[in-house]
Amino acid sequence: MGKSTLVNRIYREKTELCVCREGDYSPVDLAWCTWMSKEEYEVVLQKYAEIRDEIIKYTIEENGHFVIAYTKIITDIPNFHKDLEQYEIYNGRKNFAEWKEIVFSRFEKFRGTGYLFECAFFQNIMEDLILFHELNDEEIVEFYHELFARVDKESFRLFYLYSENIEEVLQVVKKERSDNVGNEMWYPLMMNYLKDSPYGKKHGYQDFEDMVTHFRHRQMLEMRVIEEVLGECAIVLPAKEWELEEVLAR
């Protein structure tokens, strides 16, 4: 039972919550969404005039920037999604100073309640810090000290799924995320993502063992942030054994 399962189970009991899954528009996270100037947005509207209305439907303007939840747009236009991917802020597409300012400002401005976010605080940010901006462990912990200082702590709770056996979890994910004839879909994409990152190239990432090493390192860092930064604002749950009643009681 992973992150999406946890989110779905919580929402089933708490339908009043506003759920922001990966790819949805989110007031804090920008994964799978664009971050564009007005000029860039106008170019995209002109270039893809045949789906202009769909693009507008999935666009939110934020103080002169345009956020398109572009993966929600279903189209057979060749390379549409690949084209809009270039306007994301993740995977090293922004220099560190600019990226940090965007991340910090969105968390600082957000003061809403009743939201349930998926992957917004750790996964997407942590991967960028490790793989693309190549911060060391101490710098990453300090980054989270600075970020958490900008968060409304009264309304913040982080549910963290912890696994004792990262390798076993990854083997299950490899198998589950395959097509109908057993071809692995997730693993090759994730392996290429790791191999092609600056960190992956520097450390010679090539195979499954390297992936296991990466996720162990990431989990260790996330647990450090929980212990040294978040404290009681985080609830650590066993990845396969959590009880919904315990989650809802928090």
Which positions does each model-derived feature cover?
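Walker A/P-loop
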Residues: 4
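NTP-dependent small-molecule kinase module
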Residues: 185-250
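Conserved substrate/cofactor phosphate-moiety recognition/catalytic segment
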Residues: 11-69, 127-129
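A structural motif corresponding to the C-terminal end of an alpha-helix
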Residues: 109-113, 146-159, 218-236
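Glycine-rich phosphate-binding loop used to anchor ATP phosphates in small-molecule kinases
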Residues: 54-152, 162
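Conserved phosphate-donor/acceptor-positioning beta-strand/loop module used by diverse small-molecule
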Residues: 117-120, 137-193
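Short, solvent-exposed loop/turn segments at secondary-structure junctions
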Residues: 24-26, 120-124, 164-167, 241-243
